Amino acid sequence: MFPNSKVELPKSTPVRRIGLSVQYEGSNFCGWQRQPQAVSVQQVLEDAISQLDPQRPIQAVAAGRTDAGVHAAGQVVHFDCCGPIPAERWAPALNGRLPSTIRVREAVARPASWHACHSAIYRRYRYTIYNGRRPNLFLTPWSWHRYQVRLDETMMQIALEGLLGLQDFSAFQRTGSRRAHARTTIQEVKIERQGDLIMIEIQASGFLYGMVRLLMGQLVALGEHRLNLETFERRWKEKRRQEVKEAAPAQGLCLLRAGYEEDIFSKGGWYDCQPRYSLGANDPPLDPPSAPESS
């Protein structure tokens, strides 16, 4: 039987909803969503589910549609099945059929009313910047290497805090979005430096198409003093999308988790499971940036 082929089911066959906590290394995927003539996380996961439950067409629904090259530490997915596999056995069963770049950390039974995307009350992303002098091969797949100057994370934090609340973020939305509007609520922001690594976390009710990477490009320009706060604020408040040109590369971005009104997974299987990096001894710090450009 071919994956996702549809057969007539007995009327008594119960349909169950399964929730998954999923990790993936996004470098070789076109993103979460199925695309013609490209390999997506959704396609690979659905094909694996169909091998275990071939009785019905499978649709895997995710909390966030990550772009090509973006990673996930705690993506949340649901699908409906009618086979006999207990909920808690789906994780090991799927991991035996998935490539090593996709791992299911936990599987739980959910009511039919629960939806991985629509029931989520927030999504949280982390962007990692490697701000050291020398390239590091083992950080390349997971971070953006900025080595020209030492980033001013204080300036970046000030800019981030100004974004909190319900705002129109048209300036940070790529063309091609199907959303009717560009308003969303940023609930929490955080920036942390650990030696040569800067980790920026942003949590919101939802994100626009390409929003985080466009925002990170602007923050790095701020941190390098190629952009000042006044110009940054004017760009997004006045919706000057044409002036927001540089998007941060995909490999530094990771979907940490999606949150719900109730805890769906155990904390160990879901919460902040992207590793923190330790580089050992750091090189001498980079020179600070020059004064910000005037507007």
Curated annotation (Swiss-Prot):
It is an enzyme of class 5 (isomerase). The keyword tRNA processing applies. The keyword Membrane does not apply. The active site is at D67 (nucleophile). SUPFAM superfamilies: Pseudouridine synthase (SSF55120). Substrate binds at Y125. Signal peptide: none annotated. InterPro entries: PsdUridine_synth_cat_dom_sf, PsdUridine_synth_TruA, PsdUridine_synth_TruA_a/b_dom, PsdUridine_synth_TruA_C, TruA/RsuA/RluB/E/F_N. Keywords: Isomerase, tRNA processing. CDD domains: PseudoU_synth_EcTruA. Formation of pseudouridine at positions 38, 39 and 40 in the anticodon stem and loop of transfer RNAs. Belongs to the tRNA pseudouridine synthase TruA family. NCBIfam families: hisT_truA (TIGR00071). This is tRNA pseudouridine synthase A. The gene is truA.
